[in-house]
Amino acid sequence: MEEPKTSKNENHEPKKNIICEESKAVKIISNQTLKPRNDKSEIGTSSLNRNSSKKTKQNDICIEKTEAKSCKVNAASVPGPKDLGLVHRDQSHCKMKKLPNSPMKAQKGSSQTKLEKTPSLQTKAEKVPKSPNLPVKAEKAPCTTAEATTEKALNSQRKEENTPTSQMKLQKTPRSPLEPENVPSLLLKENVKQTESQQTGKKLTSSFVSMDKRKSEALQGEKSALENSSLSQKQQTQTDNIADSDDSASGIEDTADDLSKMKSEESNKENSSEMDYLENATVIDESALTPEQRLGLKQAEERLERDHIFRLEKRSPEYTNCRYLCKLCLIHIENIQGAHKHIKEKRHKKNILEKQEESELRSLPSPSSAHLAALSVAVVELAKEQGITDDDLRIRQDIVEEMSKVIMTFLPECSLRLYGSSLTKFALKSSDVNIDIKFPPKMNHPDLLIQVLGILKKSALYIDVESDFHAKVPVVVCKDRKSALLCRVSAGNDMACLTTDLLAALGKVEPVFTPLVLAFRYWAKLCYIDSQTDGGIPSYCFALMVMFFLQQRKPPLLPCLLGSWIEGFDPKRMDDFQLKGIVEEKFVKWEYNSSSATEKNLIADENKAKADEPKDDTKKTETDNQSNAAKAKHGKSPLTLEAPNQVPLGQLWLELLKFYTLDFALEEYVICVRIQDILTRENKNWPKRRIAIEDPFSVKRNVARSLNSQLVYEYVVERFRAAYRYFACPQKKGGNKSTMDPKKKEKGKLSSKKPVKSDCSATNCCILGESAEKIHMERGQPAKHDETEFTSQRCIVDNDSLLVNELGLANHGQDSSSLSTASGGSDLKQKSAEKQGDLTPSETSLKKELSQCICIGTPDGAESAGTDCRSNLEMDSSHQIVCNNVSATSCNCKATEVTSDLVDEDNLPSQELYYVFDKFILTSGKPPTIVCSICKKDGHSKNDCPEDFRKIDLKPLPPMTNRFREILDLVCKRCFDELSPPCSEQHNREQILIGLEKFIQKEYDEKARLCLFGSSKNGFGFRDSDLDICMTLEGHENAEKLNCKEIIENLAKILKRHPGLRNILPITTAKVPIVKFEHRRSGLEGDISLYNTLAQHNTRMLATYAAIDPRVQYLGYTMKVFAKRCDIGDASRGSLSSYAYILMVLYFLQQRKPPVIPVLQEIFDGKQIPQRMVDGWNAFFFDKTEELKKRLPSLGKNTESLGELWLGLLRFYTEEFDFKEYVISIRQKKLLTTFEKQWTSKCIAIEDPFDLNHNLGAGVSRKMTNFIMKAFINGRKLFGTPFYPLIGREAEYFFDSRVLTDGELAPNDRCCRVCGKIGHYMKDCPKRKRLKKKDSEEEKEGNEEEKDSRDLLDSRDLRCFICGDAGHVRRECPEVKMARQRNSSVAAAQLVRNLVNAQQVAGSAQQQSDQSIRTRQSSECSDSPSYSPQPQPFPQNSPQPSALPPPPSQPGSQPKLGPPQQGGQPPHQVQMPLYNFPQSPPAHYSPMHSMGLLPMHPLQIPAPSWPIHGPMLHSAPGSTPSNIGLNDPSIIFAQPAARPMAIPSPSHDGHWPRTVAPNSLVNNGAVGNSEPRFRGLNPPIPWEHAPRHFPLVPASWPYGLHQNFMHQGNPRFQPKPFYAQADRCATRRCRERCPHPPRGNVSE
């Protein structure tokens, strides 16, 4: 089965040239196993399966790819795929691969001679598009004996179609009379187009046989059917090709004479010959079938035709293997078994029911005068009952006047006005009162509404005063105490007031407008589709829909607001004409404002038109006049027609429902009341989804965008159909109950059992044979209502129209294009169908058939159904549709007799007809579909959303105990003690900065100045925190006159020359362009930004806060640890940054009662805040900490402990602080609302203290917000419930990520799949670009010496296994060069031997225990530099290598290590500190290992195939490591090496239970979430010989953590374990301070 292309594709658009592109994918349904065969008769000498992909799918859909040249097809006579006639393709110019089998007896003898391929065509066989049959395994659908016989016949026919190749060598395909020999293909196409346009009528007459005619021909007998088929084929051939055998003989002679000409024009003749085959070759040659086979084929196809599946008379040029077409689903089907399978698909069933329902509605009889009168009465009565009166309007106006007096007392410059439905009189009695406040420009909109909120709360005239500032239109909601009416007060809503004035003026000049809108609004209210907050449509949109209908109906009742009467008006530039308001209550004022964007688009269109069209002076003059038009800059348009039409109100109501139910394509067009032309979605650049309504005064956005759910849209469409069905059928008075007497009822039953007329086509008649009563009873609904609803409908024979809804198939989510049948008055549907190529000239006969539908309602449909044939269409509701030899989808039924009681019903007087707006009738008893605006799920509103963390019920916490308080204090203190960098590290960071500054000044610009900011200086940095560097240039105060992007790019090129840096990456697309780098020796990452001076002041202020009270730093570190443990501390991956969490801590301490810290930005002398302008912002804060106690005597009153403050922080953000209403702002003590900042759309609002427009939570999604708040809620419970873990297990208990995050991973749906960061897609990932980029210039600069040996290699193919960097090999690695320089005393041969041979490291006699142990070397003291990380281990079954002897004369050489220790850990040994942040591990490791949160276990070390400096840890006994050579795949394809870090580290465990990268465990199991440190297998040179670096901070609080403490990550990732070096203490003083004992013999 093959699906044709969509309407946008040219293949199905009439009168367009089709270009068959290469490699088209075609879907085919086949239910039999197709064997590969060489169908020579179809493609000459080419095999069908030569290019077969040989892929098989379980759903029996195989995809073919045709790879060949493009062929141009003229489709002037090609009907659309949605046409109900048979598919008919162009007959002259499409390339095909089939050779004919003659269906005509008269030409049987000459068929082969006439149509076989020539040798030249055989030589080009592979250039022709091929559509081979692919072998497909499929389940055979159940079929009858006749169908099985038919398939045997078809198989035999396939064999007969095979033509020997030898018979095709000396024959030529005859030329079509439409195709001259010497005419080029383009000219030929034009000639053929003209000729075919003249022959269209003949072709349609001969090929498109009506359904009734084909049915009658089928009943005449086999012989006559075959003769008719032969005649039809013969007529077609005579019209398009050559008519007799003489022409064929002359064609053969021409082949011998014109062989050279044919070779020169081979492509044209190839097209003609293949197209001739398509014109002459039928899909199924019935002449080759036996009478039994023909009968079986006929019966099977009659069965398929009932389900809109028809045999193709001609093979489709695109789907050559398909014989049938489902005209309901527009699917090409290969055989009968495939057709039966397609019938059972949900898509086909859904389309059947939709087709049935649409046909029902279109076939409803025209309303009588009594019917229209009853409708008019119902609408008028509804308007009187539900609409507001003049007295109601006066009450609402009085409310506005009273409120105006109250508000103007405090705000005299403001004024109030009434707008909305109250002013237009479209309001229902329960509608709100909409009030708008006009205010001067100097006032702020948020401040005004906040003041109004306070004023109304103090007033005694109003109750229930609340704010709804998070709505699309922020309002203050209150209730008038006297009238109990709900009031909504907005401010500055000018556009809504203008629209209100327009609708109010229309209600005054057009009397039918107001009752229609009231009825429409009340219907929407009953169906609950007017609730904007629950995914419905705004109520005033229904007034615009009524206005649009009155403009589009024929004849119209209302004029459009803009049109051709305006001088120079152009619909393409309609946005240049802006509506300004109502004038004189009869006109709308407009102004012309030229739009540059519109002009550019228009100029582009004009240029394109000039290029495509020939030059014409007349057209040029018209274009000039049009472009120079619109001389009038303003004007006015009338609101009424000069000669208004008088139409009954009931007729308008019925037409309104029909217009939006059947005529207007809601998903295709825009409801626009400004112009008469239909506005498409493309004109507005709006997506084709659901409903689009344009406000005439606010034209940029779709006002119906609140309907953002497909479920709600389908519910709305269903309600439209139900309403039209109800009001279009006559309803009796008295509760809609049938008044038929039993005799007449029985007579109706008997009469309905009579057979239908013989001229009723079997493909167009349907009887649904299951009563609605039975369905209702099965669903448990009362039978009384079933009888009421059923008898009130006048529908197709025996069918209640509610059956479609009850079957439950109308809401299937599968998208499929339904076949729209055009009705007489459906102009918009016709336009859409013509645009999509859906309808062909055969639609005329279809309309005629549909117009003959007579719908007769009978009380009991079950008894009236015939039982001659039953169709077991499977439906979801397990009901069966009983067919009486007729279609299950059509409504073209003609009954032989109509019961007298139903005929009399048409003549009932208007008093007997009665209509009521009843909720149960209009909704069919179905509840409304509600979609949450927060999570976009149905079934609940946003107020009941389960994903809203504010709805979580927090259980009260037990009281705090002293012992538990002490434990919390200790946990918070240790976070600071173990993670804060020592002074030596600060010194090393400054040295790195100085070195970089000197290098940049020397290589780039001597005026460059660098300074540190961020975590390195603000007092909250970790030991491995990044280096945040700001670069400035002397002579430039700011970067206004600098090209920052160019400077950053040039700086990156310069830094790539720095031998001590790696991984240089410029990021110029960020808000602040930066250059990222990594320092090789320390492993620290950093970034350099330009003129980020405001961040420097932020750094100073945070450092000042940290210096005020030590508890500030303690809590800041605890918060950062908490965020990292829960994987919620990385802004680049969609969460909050560590800076944001520090601001949260400071805000909590400021709001604490009594406060712990003051608000530094509010401490100043005088009344005016001092100005310290930086980058346009005031960066002032009070920085004299020594004077704070004098100014604020109450500063030290808060004496809470760390544990109490930490728990109070968790409780503050989970219990007290409202993230929806307030902003976290440390610049003021007063609460700052999100409405004031206009950040109501953000889930978390954290204001930068200086850059007031910067919201640090702007990038946090709702999913991430819920995840963050869930961690805080779980942390509140964990830290607030007293529990006493084992000594040494406190951190494992309190920072268990599985408990804090409920075992879930942080949302990463917004992250790039390559780098894990947000802000770009995978295709734009800088890491991906960097891997693919070819830096040829840098390659030449860095590798000039070895250029000749690598001329043919790409830089991406080169990777050093020492450092892991791409672009060079091992011998060029700068680390190897540095190693040679450092180890000058080591002989060259020794170095080569160390790099190549596997060696074993000698160890001391002590054995290493299960717990990882860190010792210092004899040459180190407490301030000695740290080790460098060791390479990743190899499989443990490798033999233990030999030791690497140290250089004998080098003073800094490292001693040998003894063998690993055995047994348990000695009592005097101390485990690793909890938060000691040491060396960052290798790839996919995180610095959080050093927190002690990862398991520490002894690991074995493989033989070093690279230079190793310093001692190494040994594995436990029992393992036999093997030698590893340089050719080992684990080396060649290894991850980049470890990131060196100048901080001591314990050895890390490589035996993870689920083999996950340890950094993924640190970051809550999300693999690759933290910044991966790709460094290759081998570490860089350590800092043994460098100046003093980061010392080990002795820890007195040991923690031994279980390896399952961390959250496990993706098991698919296979990490390489990491090994750290062991250190040894050199002196007694060092050993006393070091918690680890020395190993080996150490001299005192």
Curated annotation (Swiss-Prot):
Recorded phenotype for the gene knockout or disruption: Double conditional knockouts that have deleted both TUT4 and TUT7 at the secondary oocyte stage are infertile. Females ovulate normal numbers of oocytes with normal morphology of antral follicles but with a slight decrease in the frequency of surrounded nucleolus state oocytes. Mutant oocytes are unable to support early embryonic development, they fail to complete meiosis I properly.
A Gene Ontology biological process in which this protein takes part is: positive regulation of interleukin-6 production
The UniProt regions of compositional bias labelled Polar residues, in chain numbering, are 108-123, 146-156, 163-174, 194-209, 226-242
Residue ranges with Low complexity bias: 815-827, 1402-1427, 1451-1473
Q: Where does UTP bind?
A: 1015-1018, 1025-1028, 1098, 1120, 1138-1142, 1254
Q: Binding residues for Mg(2+), per the UniProt record? A: 1026, 1028
Report whether Zinc shows up as a keyword of the record: yes
Provide the residue positions that the database annotates as binding Zn(2+). Answer: 326, 329, 342, 348
Molecular function GO terms recorded: miRNA binding; RNA uridylyltransferase activity; uridylyltransferase activity; zinc ion binding
Phosphoserine-modified residues are where? Answer: 102, 131, 176
EC number(s) per UniProt? Answer: 2.7.7.52
Q: Where is the composition biased (Basic and acidic residues)?
A: 258-272, 603-623, 828-837
Extract the ranges annotated as region (Disordered).
30-60, 75-277, 603-640, 733-759, 812-841, 1329-1350, 1402-1483
Query: Where in this chain does the record put each PAP-associated domain?
Result: 649-698, 1201-1254
Q: Does the keyword Zinc-finger apply?
A: yes
Q: List the Gene3D superfamilies.
A: 1.10.1410.10, Beta Polymerase, domain 2, Zinc finger, CCHC-type
Q: Where is the composition biased (Pro residues)?
A: 1428-1450
> What does the UniProt record say this protein does?
Uridylyltransferase that mediates the terminal uridylation of mRNAs with short (less than 25 nucleotides) poly(A) tails, hence facilitating global mRNA decay. Essential for both oocyte maturation and fertility. Through 3' terminal uridylation of mRNA, sculpts, with TUT7, the maternal transcriptome by eliminating transcripts during oocyte growth. Involved in microRNA (miRNA)-induced gene silencing through uridylation of deadenylated miRNA targets. Also functions as an integral regulator of microRNA biogenesiS using 3 different uridylation mechanisms.
- Domain comment text? Utilizes two multidomain functional modules during the switch from monouridylation to oligouridylation. The catalytic module (containing the 3 CCHC-type Zinc finger domains) is essential for both activities while the Lin28-interacting module (LIM) at the N-terminal part is indispensable for oligouridylation.
Q: What is this protein called?
A: Terminal uridylyltransferase 4
Species of provenance: Mus musculus (Mouse)
Which gene holds the coding sequence for this protein? Tut4
